[in-house]
Amino acid sequence: NEVFVLAHELGHAGHFYLAHKNQNLFNARPSTYFIEAPSTMNEMLMANYLLSNSNDPRFKRWVIASIVSRTYYHNFVTHLLEAAYQRKVYEIIDAGGSINAPKLNEIKRGVLEEFWGGEVEIIDGAELTWMRQPHYYMGLYPYTYSAGLTISTQMSQRILKEGEPAVAQWLEVLKAGGTKSPVELAQMAGVDVTTEAPLRETIAYIGSLIDELEALTAEIEAAEAVK
């Protein structure tokens, strides 16, 4: 499982290396909005490689389960809910209100209940999870994971379909560093983040992963039934 973490952090390392190699000190650092695109792209590239080089349904199921539970659930759900929570906290402060630990607990629980509705039971203590998240002390950071993952999902699919030309285009994006705005960087990758289309397409891709996960499980269970 930690291989996905290693791939993620190497994505940051490769991004910063290329940006600093091709830009000056003042232009090298990219926008925070884009910062998690290269890291999550590495997770997607590794997963695609593992899937394309194995015929073992159990292994492929593990890879897809890892993508869904780590790459997508962690970045698309956990961090996005943290961003929603952070927004509500800032709205109170901007309106001249004050907060304390019980209030923060109340807000966190409200965000969880609003998102999950009646589908998931929110147990006692779930509202305390805001206490362990260092990203809250890094400015408006949590939302960048879902933003970056939307871009990397679209680009990784292009690499699968187009091959080397898409790879070369992505390397140019990484080399650009902070010389382009987030919208421009995404456009260089062929992704228009000014519309909701990339987000909807990414959600549809997650749905296709779930379908594949179910198909692999059915295949495994059918094989076991024959034994």
Q: What is each PLM-predicted segment?
A:
Residues 3-4, 24-35, 74, 137, ...:
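Alpha-helix N-cap/helix-initiation motif
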Residues 19, 29-59, 68-70, 74, ...:
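Post-HExxH zinc-binding segment in Zn-dependent metallohydrolases
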Residues 22-32, 61-70, 90-92, 132-133:
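Short beta-alpha connecting loops at secondary-structure transitions
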Residues 1-9:
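Short alpha-helical catalytic segment bearing the HExxH-like zincin motif
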Residues 6-7, 14, 41, 52, ...:
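C-terminal, non-catalytic "cap/extension" segments appended to globular domains
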Residues 2, 30-34, 60, 100, ...:
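Conserved acidic
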